[in-house]
C-alpha cells in the first residue's frame, strides 16, 4: 500500500476513532471519517488480544490484501480494528466481511470510480 494511502500519525488515528462512524463485523470493526482529500487513507489496529506478533502481523496482512482488491470511494479515512478471530480466518472470508462493512458505510465504490490499493 502506498504511503499516501496510509494513516500514519497518532492524531489521524485519534480523529477517526473519536469522530468517525462505527460499523461492526464479526472479524473487524471499521471506523470511517470523511477527509476532504482526493484519496482515501486506511489504518489498521491489531491489539494483543489477537495473539502474539506473528498472529497480529498475519491479521494485518489479511486485512491489507482484502482492501487491495476492493475499490473505495475517494475522500475517506478508514481505521480497521481487528477482532480476536481475524488471524485465524482465510483471506476470502475477511474479504467478504470487509466488503460488507464498506457496503454498510456506503464507501464501496463502483468499478468505474474505484481507488484500489495496488502495491508497487
Swiss-Prot record:
Any one Pfam family match given in the protein's UniProt record, by short name: Ribonuclease_P
Keywords in alphabetical order: Endonuclease, Hydrolase, Nuclease, RNA-binding, tRNA processing
Cellular component GO terms held in the UniProt record: ribonuclease P complex
Reaction catalyzed: Endonucleolytic cleavage of RNA, removing 5'-extranucleotides from tRNA precursor
Organism: Dehalococcoides mccartyi (strain CBDB1)
GO BP term (any one): tRNA 5'-leader removal
SUPFAM superfamilies tied to this protein: Ribosomal protein S5 domain 2-like
Keyword Transferase carried by entry: no
Subunit (UniProt): Consists of a catalytic RNA component (M1 or rnpB) and a protein subunit.
The enzyme's E.C. designation: 3.1.26.5
Family assignment from sequence similarity: Belongs to the RnpA family.
GO terms, molecular function: 3'-tRNA processing endoribonuclease activity; ribonuclease P activity; tRNA binding
Name under which the protein is recorded: Ribonuclease P protein component
Domain of life: Bacteria
Protein's job: RNaseP catalyzes the removal of the 5'-leader sequence from pre-tRNA to produce the mature 5'-terminus. It can also cleave other RNA substrates such as 4.5S RNA. The protein component plays an auxiliary but essential role in vivo by binding to the 5'-leader sequence and broadening the substrate specificity of the ribozyme.
Amino acid at each position: 500500500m502506498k504511503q499516501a494511502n496510509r494513516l500514519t500519525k497518532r492524531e489521524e488515528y485519534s480523529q477517526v476513532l473519536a469522530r468517525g462512524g462505527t460499523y461492526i463485523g464479526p472479524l473487524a470493526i471499521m471506523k470511517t471519517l470523511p477527509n476532504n482529500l482526493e484519496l482515501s487513507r486506511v489504518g489498521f489496529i491489531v491489539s494483543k488480544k489477537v495473539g502474539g506478533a506473528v498472529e497480529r502481523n498475519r491479521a494485518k496482512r489479511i486485512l491489507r490484501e482484502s482492501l487491495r482488491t476492493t475499490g473505495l470511494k475517494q475522500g475517506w479515512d478508514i481505521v480497521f480494528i481487528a477482532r480476536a478471530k481475524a488471524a485465524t480466518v482465510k483471506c476470502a472470508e475477511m474479504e467478504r466481511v470487509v466488503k460488507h462493512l464498506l457496503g454498510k458505510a456506503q464507501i464501496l465504490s463502483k468499478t468505474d470510480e474505484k481507488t484500489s490499493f495496488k502495491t508497487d
